[in-house]
């Protein structure tokens, strides 16, 4: 049993003086517990974040006591009966940068240790890198769970999570101070329409850091139990969910878990389980019986409720069978149909008919949602008929053509992973004739007259894909090469998605942070 204790050893750096490069300790205690009226001048430090500036600001806030009006500050806060501005944006950006530097390397190294093999880390950055993985793995699995990461989470829980990383007391005094005075303190992630501008706009860096810290925390616990599920068959699951001294319990798991427990959660060994997270949601795909899948479902619910104090109802997690369910993922509709093939086998004078079920991942382009997205951005009407873009009519011909070409090529590049590319021709048709109508509107002409005047066959050829150009240049080429261009092509250079795909995610119902 001692070999498990080495694995369960806490792999987290305990930073003692995380804020020492930025602040004087006396200033932190003064900020957190002092109720004196100390103010600073409103100096234009926008977009000029540096460690030296933050350190000087903290010193001024502690020493200067004169009252000064802030003419350029529209979001004034009241403290002790006066209006003041602590330049919270600069300070939070400053220690956000410091915390990122300290955490990023540690998290990167720990994530690489958790991987069995990392051959090409840069290739994993592409959005398309997940689809070849699905092609190889999903056909052998039978259940999929859609997990919506719950929020809001109380800010005090985040502070407690940071306590197990950092022992610098002044850091927690400062972060509690800002949370209390510059946020609503009830939740870090309020509803969409009520997102606090303090976190979402002015301090996006610290907002993203805290959110990623929260997600990383619950995923680290899940992965730990997943990797050691076969060795933890008789361990009580509530041992892991208690907030106080969780990591100490995890370190000494062997001694603690031997005690008698009233309820026992039996973990199971299953190598066919995969977890993918994206855009505030996650997917758990596995091959198990419905009973064991429901155990994983309630594990997540208990984890959020007992560990993070977040109420997550059963509707947070949906379980579906892959063979009977198609789901939307990163702009594609994915399904695993079962194709039945009949093979005749003959042995001497006897012949047999053997039925073989072949599973294959289908990546379908969601044409109707894409057309709705184009209609909202005024490339076509609700019926799918192309219309001109009057907003672009004042630009040059080269600019208009370049904008349409980039949109069309980005679409073709992103959806080249679909084996049924003919369904995408309607989208290309809308973009082509929307471009022509925009140019005709600019030159105050009809579409027919504009095409005759400029002989715009060349204009339309610019919108052809690689497969179309290949068939035009080499009309008598071999069938093998044509099949190559008709097949799926996943690119490893797609790091971002265009706005239309993001809008498509919103229409389907996926929350984007």
Swiss-Prot record:
The keyword RNA-binding applies. The lineage of its organism: Eukaryota, Viridiplantae, Streptophyta, Embryophyta, Tracheophyta. The gene is matK. GO terms for cellular component: chloroplast. It comes from Phaseolus vulgaris. The keyword Plastid applies. This is Maturase K. Its main location: plastid. It holds the Pfam family Intron_maturas2. Belongs to the intron maturase 2 family. MatK subfamily. It is found in: Plastid, Chloroplast.
């Amino acid at each position: 049993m001692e070999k498990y204790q080495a694995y369960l050893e806490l792999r987290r750096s305990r930073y003692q003086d995380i804020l020492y490069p930025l602040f004087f300790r006396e200033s932190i205690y003064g900020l957190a517990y002092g109720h004196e009226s100390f103010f600073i001048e409103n100096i234009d430090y926008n977009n000029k974040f540096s460690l030296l500036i933050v350190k000087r600001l903290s010193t001024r806030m502690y020493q200067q006591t004169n009252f000064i009006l802030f003419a350029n500050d529209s979001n004034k806060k009241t403290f002790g009966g006066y209006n003041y501005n602590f330049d919270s944006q600069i300070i939070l950006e400053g220690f956000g940068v410091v915390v990122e530097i300290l955490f990023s390397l540690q998290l990167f190294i720990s994530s690489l240790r958790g991987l069995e093999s990392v051959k090409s880390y840069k290739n994993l950055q592409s959005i398309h890198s997940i689809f070849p993985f699905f092609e190889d793995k999903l056909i052998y699995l039978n259940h999929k769970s859609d997990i919506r990461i719950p929020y809001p989470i109380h800010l005090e829980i985040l502070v407690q999570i940071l306590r197990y990383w950092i022992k610098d007391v002044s850091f927690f005094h400062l972060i509690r101070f800002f949370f209390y005075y510059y946020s609503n303190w009830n939740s870090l992630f309020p509803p969409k329409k009520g997102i606090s501008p303090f976190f979402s706009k002015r301090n996006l860096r610290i907002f993203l850091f805290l959110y990623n810290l929260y997600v990383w925390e619950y995923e680290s616990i899940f992965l730990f139990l997943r990797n050691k599920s076969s060795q933890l068959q008789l361990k009580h699951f509530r041992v892991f969910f208690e907030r106080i001294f969780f990591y100490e319990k995890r370190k000494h798991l062997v001694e603690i878990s031997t005690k008698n427990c009233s309820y026992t959660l039996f973990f199971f060994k299953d190598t066919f389980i995969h977890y993918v997270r994206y855009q505030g949601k996650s997917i758990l795909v596995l091959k198990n019986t419905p009973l064991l899948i429901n155990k994983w479902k309630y594990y997540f619910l208990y984890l959020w409720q007992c560990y993070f104090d977040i109420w997550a109802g059963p509707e947070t997690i949906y379980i579906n069978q892959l063979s009977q369910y198609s789901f939307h993922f990163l702009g594609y509709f994915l399904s695993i149909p079962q194709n039945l093939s009949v093979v005749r086998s003959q042995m001497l004078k006897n012949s047999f008919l053997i039925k073989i079920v072949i599973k294959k991942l289908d990546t379908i382009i969601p044409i109707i949602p894409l057309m709705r997205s184009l209609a909202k951005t005024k490339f076509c009407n609700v019926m799918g008929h192309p219309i001109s873009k009057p907003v672009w009519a004042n630009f040059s011909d080269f600019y208009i053509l370049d904008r349409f070409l980039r949109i069309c090529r980005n679409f073709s590049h992103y959806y080249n992973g679909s084996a049924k590319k003919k369904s995408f021709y309607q989208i290309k048709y809308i973009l082509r004739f929307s471009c022509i109508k925009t140019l005709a509107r600019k030159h105050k002409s009809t579409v027919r007259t504009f095409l005759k005047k400029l002989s715009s066959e060349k204009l339309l050829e610019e919108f052809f894909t690689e497969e179309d150009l290949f068939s035009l240049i080499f009309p008598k080429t071999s069938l093998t090469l044509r099949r190559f261009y008709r097949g799926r092509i996943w690119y490893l250079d797609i790091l971002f998605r265009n706005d239309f795909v993001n809008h498509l995610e919103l229409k389907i119902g996926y929350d984007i942070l």
